[in-house]
Amino acid sequence: MEISRDALARMIDHTLLRTDATPAQVSALIAEARELGVFSVCVSPSMLPLTDDLAPLKVATVCGFPSGNHTPATKAAEAAESSRLGADEIDMVINIGHLKAGEPHRVIEEIVTACRAAEEAGADFVKTSTGFHPAGGANTHAVALMAATVNGRLGVKASGGIRDWNTAQEMVAAGATRLGLSASRAILEGAPA
């Protein structure tokens, strides 16, 4: 079942995480987010000072991004600083190498293990990907597996590679409760009339 344009907009983290993003581009992202009626903006921690007083928009940022190879202490410090700077939500990237070292090398088992670890750690959401890996971003198989694993106890954020209305709808149908998008306008403009 397809959800409406407005319902989809309320699921979007309007995202700008490019390493070359400028303050002017972040300000434009915020203005566009307000215009589109999305749930939140997601920016790099260094851009958080530009996000003061965005209510009703929420502010998300990243931690350990994009590789996840930071130490736990570094991630904790980064998360604390981001929270102090006003982040409502933090997307923390796990260390895939550590996950693989203790588990079989099967991707499905790694995804399930990561979802369970996130739940045990008290996370509110699990996220498919950063969108920065050469292998691509979210896919419906991973979203469905994650949604089945967390079974409504956590949200599922599909992120990376979602560029059109139909793909966004497929992610929601697969179980995504949030969408991390840099192409929000194009996707919402692709909604059926």
Which residues make up each language-model segment?
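Alpha/beta enzyme core
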Residues: 2-36, 40-41, 46-156, 164-186, ...
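Short hydrophobic "strand-cap" motifs at the C-terminus of beta-strands
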Residues: 159
